[in-house]
Amino acid sequence: MSTPEIDPRTFRNVLGQFCTGITIITTTHEDVPVGFACQSFAALSLEPPLVLFCPTKQSRSWAAIEASGKFCVNVLAEDQREVSARFGSREPDKFAGINWRPSGLGSPIINGSLAHIDCEVANVHDGGDHWVVFGSVKELSERAVIPSAESAARPLLFYRGQYTGIEPDKNTPADWRNDLEAFLTATTEDTWL
């Protein structure tokens, strides 16, 4: 029994129903920062700490990452759509106008990203028209969130071919409401009600 051929457009449309975060995978090669936008990123193992991402086999950025043996995963925030678009483009200098600092291994950490994961390339596996790259995590951190700015600290998401974000749950009371209710309804020894 033969398997029916899968139409590439249908394949993309169906997989587009799965919402993903957006990362920028970066490295430095011959002292030049390199990076690309990547949705195919995932945690792989806690012990040892491993992550994975899947670049296309034609990716020039992957060639630089492979040569350097290191990379940094930058998890983008909701307000970084322009950063994602820039790194998803064919611009020759994707870092023009992008503020960044070097990670412990020397790969770019993009300012404003929600988190970064600094890795060494551990293994590379064939994945059809992509490579499946395992990274050994060497350092990681998340952006410090100021309580009043917490609403701005949401991930940038991609769903059905478009950017999207997380809407606050309008059915759950805000934290201040819970705190106020607890304060107003708390009883103590001197409560006279």
Regions found by a protein language model. Give the residues of each.
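Basic, polyanion-binding surface patches
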Residues: 1-193
